[in-house]
Amino acid sequence: MSALHQLSALNFLVIGLGAAFGAWTRWLLGLSLNPLFVALPLGTLAANVIGGYLVGVAVGIFHINTHFSLAWKLFAITGFLGGLTTFSTFSAEVVERLLAGQPAWAIGLASVHLAGSLTATYLGLLTVGATRIWA
């Protein structure tokens, strides 16, 4: 399917709905978790690690079960998980630590996000048995 054929009203709608639900989820995670440990914004970390896990699950499921429509893939991955995970907030929080003269915290924060998200994505693929596809 060409990119032009994917530009349908339904696809715009499902991406937008998914993104709204993902962003609301991220906002609620921030509200509930960020106050727990101010030095490490746990809401952003949770959003990125949970999103990493769920994208692994989704990619695995969609790869194994080819009967899912493009709309479901766009809703789940591009919409919901795109709205849930947040590279811009993560970047701002790391730079905030650097500007506060806390380079060790900045490096640690970046490392935890990267390692956590990549590990969670792999675990998501393992959950649905999708790693054997690429072996």
Curated annotation (Swiss-Prot):
Ways its activity is controlled: Na(+) is not transported, but it plays an essential structural role and its presence is essential for fluoride channel function.
Keywords from the UniProt entry: Cell inner membrane, Cell membrane, Ion channel, Ion transport, Membrane, Metal-binding, Sodium, Transmembrane, Transmembrane helix, Transport
Subcellular compartments: Cell inner membrane
Domain of life where this protein originates: Bacteria
Chain sites annotated for binding Na(+): G82, T85
Molecular function in Gene Ontology: fluoride channel activity; metal ion binding
Membrane topology: Multi-pass membrane protein
Cellular component terms (Gene Ontology): plasma membrane
One Pfam family linked to the record: CRCB
Reactions it catalyzes: fluoride(in) = fluoride(out)
Protein's GO biological process: cellular detoxification of fluoride
Ranges annotated as spanning the membrane: 12-32, 42-62, 70-90, 106-126
HAMAP family according to UniProt: FluC
Known role: Fluoride-specific ion channel. Important for reducing fluoride concentration in the cell, thus reducing its toxicity.
Family per record: Belongs to the fluoride channel Fluc/FEX (TC 1.A.43) family.
Stated name of the protein: Fluoride-specific ion channel FluC
Organism: Dechloromonas aromatica (strain RCB)
